[in-house]
Amino acid sequence: MNYEFEREIGFINSQPSLAECLTSFPPVADTFQSSSIKTSTLSHSTLIPPPFEQTIPSLNPGSHPRHGAGVGGRPKSSPAGSRGSPVPAGALQPPEYPWMKEKKAAKKTALPPAAASTGPACLGHKESLEIADGSGGGSRRLRTAYTNTQLLELEKEFHFNKYLCRPRRVEIAALLDLTERQVKVWFQNRRMKHKRQTQCKENQNSEGKFKNLEDSDKVEEDEEEKSLFEQALSVSGALLEREGYTFQQNALSQQQAPNGHNGDSQTFPVSPLTSNEKNLKHFQHQSPTVPNCLSTMGQNCGAGLNNDSPEAIEVPSLQDFNVFSTDSCLQLSDALSPSLPGSLDSPVDISADSFDFFTDTLTTIDLQHLNY
């Protein structure tokens, strides 16, 4: 700082000191010589910045007016200053080399923001950019931005015609300020979009129909299961009723005598149980000989009616035969045989008096079952 301050003060003084001249001139000459050598060897290939002394006017001795006035006896200072002061014009503008040239990819990346900022109105400029990019080869085209009016007209035309003929395509391109290629590409893309939309709708409809079919199948299966269950219940109920009815008929048939004379079956109408039938049922559980007794009584009764005997026709009042009860019949049957057979083919011999007695007594019991 003191050195520079003294030099600035020396600008006012007309006579500089000897030490100041000795310290300032030799390095300046060396720098000028080195700069001239470098410029000659490189042959203006690169731009070399000026020396540090030239950037600061206070440190440049050639531009200082006091050097010309004070140090006039030294001729070396002026030629050195004259050699270093002029700068050639070629050094300021270096030549371009292949590695210094900008690539087209960098230009393409820089162009889309500018194109987007201009808006969709500059269609002619965009077309020129697309042509320039297409000539480069291997690079991707810029996407065309259509205006609302262009899209509206294109959609209208697509609604009526999915495919365009050449004259119509040229007409639409001229009407909408587009190229024929742009119109063709837009229609291709629109057809693909329409195809995707229709396929999605068909898939959704098929899925909905399939779901409806599955639901209807499930409902039908449930209804079939319910109907089968109801049928099984009704069949089981009918079987139970039938079994109960057959059981009741079997019980009643066991109480009656179904066998007739000479193997002919004789059926009796079903009537409600009377007091005598109840007594017979009671004795049926007590002794196994009651059905045999009843069968013999039915056979004797049938024989008496078929022979038209006066004993069978002349029926006395039932009050006269109250003496003969079922107990007496059972006692008589037990007295005659411990195991009385139920058929006429029995090998046991019974006397005629006993048959007459049975016919007289049993006809009165069987007459109670007849409906007059």
UniProtKB/Swiss-Prot annotation:
InterPro entries listed in its UniProt record: HD (IPR001356), HD_metazoa (IPR020479), Homeobox_Antennapedia_CS (IPR001827), Homeobox_CS (IPR017970), Homeodomain-like_sf (IPR009057)
GO molecular function: DNA-binding transcription repressor activity, RNA polymerase II-specific; RNA polymerase II cis-regulatory region sequence-specific DNA binding; sequence-specific DNA binding
Keyword Nucleus: yes
Organism: Mus musculus
GO biological-process terms attached to the record: anterior/posterior pattern specification; brain segmentation; cell fate commitment; cell fate determination; cellular response to retinoic acid; dorsal/ventral pattern formation; embryonic skeletal system development; embryonic skeletal system morphogenesis
Residue numbers covered by motif Antp-type hexapeptide: 96-101
Domain of life: Eukaryota
Lineage: Eukaryota, Metazoa, Chordata, Craniata, Vertebrata
Locations listed in the record: Nucleus
Protein name: Homeobox protein Hox-A2
CDD domains the UniProt entry points to: homeodomain
